[in-house]
Amino acid sequence: MGEISQETVEKYLEANPQFAKEYFNRKLQVEVPSGGAQAPASASFPGRTLAEEAALYLELLEVLLEEAGSVELAAHRALQRLAQLLQADRCSMFLCRARNGTPEVASKLLDVTPTSKFEDNLVVPDREAVFPLDVGIVGWVAHTKKTFNVPDVKKNSHFSDFMDKQTGYVTRNLLATPIVMGKEVLAVFMAVNKVDASEFSKQDEEVFSKYLSFVSIILKLHHTNYLYNIESRRSQILMWSANKVFEELTDVERQFHKALYTVRTYLNCERYSIGLLDMTKEKEFYDEWPVKLGEVEPYKGPKTPDGREVIFYKIIDYILHGKEEIKVIPTPPMDHWTLISGLPTYVAENGFICNMLNAPADEYFTFQKGPVDETGWVIKNVLSLPIVNKKEDIVGVATFYNRKDGKPFDEYDEHIAETLTQFLGWSLLNTDTYEKMNKLENRKDIAQEMLMNHTKATPDEIKSILKFKEKLNIDVIEDCEEKQLVTILKEDLPDPRTADLYEFRFRHLPITEHELIKCGLRLFFEINVVEKFKVPVEVLTRWMYTVRKGYRAVTYHNWRHGFNVGQTMFTLLMTGRLKKYYTDLEAFAMLAAAFCHDIDHRGTNNLYQMKSTSPLARLHGSSILERHHLEYSKTLLQDESLNIFQNLNKRQYETVIHLFEVAIIATDLALYFKKRTMFQKIVDACEKMETEEEAIKYVTIDPTKKEIIMAMMMTACDLSAITKPWEVQSQVALLVANEFWEQGDLERTVLQQQPIPMMDRNKKDELPKLQVGFIDFVCTFVYKEFSRFHKEITPMLNGLQNNRVEWKSLADEYDEKMKVIEEMKKQEEGNTTEKAVEDSGGGGDDKKSKTCLML
């Protein structure tokens, strides 16, 4: 045979890599040369050089790289080599995890020898040996996170012979070390029974530690990747469930179903089931009768922590293995495969998270040991947890079955499932809120219907004003033509000149409230809006009568006040000639808003609403009563039979509603001081203009200026009683004062607070002084500026000034009276003091003792 060249050998080895690998594995332990220079010896591997030690690590890295896809395979190859290097009889790997909040170790690779097969050493999930950390040396290693070299296990208090009894193997000594990542123990590696010695040496510990430091890289890499997948799944679950939860707000079942079905691919299980609990806490009285009569046994079954009977009214099964399927079972029977074990009921009763390994073997719960249905599917591992809402009531139970990779559910699965169920539970707040809103909306509709029934003008009340039956001999108003109704209504309305409707001095006291309704109707005809905007007179009559009924029978803010404000608005527009700045539609809206501005007033002011925390105060943050008057007015217009603006187009109607908002909110005196400077600037600008047309153009070209003037007009109308003739003003002022005193009485009795002087009945004699202050501080500016703006409005200022003279006279009389009383009081106090001095004996020496007698 010829000589083999180096080139031939290289070609053969390259062509047969498996042979080359096996050959070098066998020849790895080379003999130390006997002569010549020796290579440096390894401290960790006796009998090997540093080069050979490096070759071992290189081989390990190649193995780890080759088996990087499976942590079990990589660990198995490493344990095989360790068993050889340490001369250990066998090696094992235990994984560390946590379930139900309790850490534990579970066997993953057992009895690994240099020649054993991976399949024989791998422990499948349903055959794992699981220990808590307080059992066995492996548990103690995981607990302390330290390496332990135990020369004699019988002398170690932590040793447990459980595994020996199961396998018949006898453990004499062992070496165990943890793989730690941060504060978390990932696994425990163990070498058992030194073959050529009675115990593992210090050098064995070093070999074990160094070798496993490389293995730990793979474990940490896999664990990091696992944590990344966990967080990715968690974020996807939260994102998709949030997306679906906010898609569905009307029904909790549909909300749950949309969210749970969308995230099914991220739950990593074969099946999951959602049981929805009956939320009824108290039974109806008629359901309790049979129990009280003894005909039915009282309920003695499990109850939720808040006292509800555990009744699943619906179960939804999500089957993800094989053909995907969703089954909805209303009123499920107790022998349904999810309920028969008793686990969902237990979770609903106690609120615990239950993570069960090898569930069919559990003795407490009765899981089916065989297939649960025709698919042949078998329960292995179970994770069940409650769905809890923000009130901490258990609303359902979510149960997950069989992790797809065959492993039991771990603490990270618990975290993901808990995140999902917690989010679903909290999302119930949306549906609960939506349901409450619906109920409130329905109650509002019912209340509105009741309100309309009692407030809306009846047919007989309409007939009392619109006398179609008497004049047309027609029984049903629908049979009348609109022109006929207009004619008979206008005939029956008062003459505006005779009734002084164009005058600022108009007096309402001699006129009945019913006649005031007719006067109000007349004003709409006077501004020519009824025919122009095609307002049905029946609707106008019904609206005006309903507005009158909407005012409560309070002392001052009643229908008479409402009408007076409307009449003053009309007078400002027509007599005061402010109409030239506004269109007919705007004038129509302003007049209607003036009539409605205090509708449903309660006789108390905004401050009282806030102090008493009334529903109105909770509903409206500012301008409380004004916003209520506005909403009431808009509510009336929502009824077609009361909508006097029904024939306007959309844009016109929106304009009217906007003007209503500006006009009615402007009556809040708290806003008066904000707007009066702006109004004064408009007046100053108009006063400098030479022609009327120039002033009209200046105002009308800017909608904001028109709104400011309108807001100030509403204030002037609201305070107009202060400008009426003295005989009217003096009576009205007493009505206002009485209403204030009534509020003061409420503050004193209900709120237990001392009212301010203006509302204190005990200080009613100070009314003239308070009126003078009110005129000077609030009213004078309004009417002075309007008189400057339009000379036609000067009568209001004159009336105000005349009334101030009267009130000042009364205030001065009161001050004089109080001054006299004060002087008399001082004089009386002086006399009392002199008498006290005389009685004390200071007046002379002839005073005798009343207790001692000189004989």
From Swiss-Prot:
GO terms for cellular component: plasma membrane. Belongs to the cyclic nucleotide phosphodiesterase family. Residues 823-855 are annotated as: Disordered. Composed of two alpha' subunits that are associated with 3 smaller proteins of 11, 13, and 15 kDa. Residues 70-219, 251-428 form the GAF domain. The gene is PDE6C. Binds 2 divalent metal cations per subunit. Site 1 may preferentially bind zinc ions, while site 2 has a preference for magnesium and/or manganese ions. This is Cone cGMP-specific 3',5'-cyclic phosphodiesterase subunit alpha'. The keyword Metal-binding applies. Its EC number is 3.1.4.35. Keywords: Cell membrane, cGMP, cGMP-binding, Hydrolase, Lipoprotein, Membrane, Metal-binding, Methylation, Nucleotide-binding, Prenylation, Repeat, Sensory transduction, Vision. Residues 853-855 form a propeptide. Residues 481-814 form the PDEase domain. As cone-specific cGMP phosphodiesterase, it plays an essential role in light detection and cone phototransduction by rapidly decreasing intracellular levels of cGMP. A lipid is attached at residue 852 (S-geranylgeranyl cysteine). Pfam families: GAF (PF01590), PDEase_I (PF00233). A divalent metal cation 1 binds at residues 561, 597-598, 718. InterPro entries: GAF (IPR003018), GAF-like_dom_sf (IPR029016), HD/PDEase_dom (IPR003607), PDEase (IPR023088), PDEase_catalytic_dom (IPR002073), PDEase_catalytic_dom_sf (IPR036971), PDEase_CS (IPR023174). PROSITE patterns: PDEASE_I_1, PDEASE_I_2. It catalyses: 3',5'-cyclic GMP + H2O = GMP + H(+). Its cofactor is a divalent metal cation. One of its GO terms (molecular function) is cGMP binding. It is a lipid-anchor.
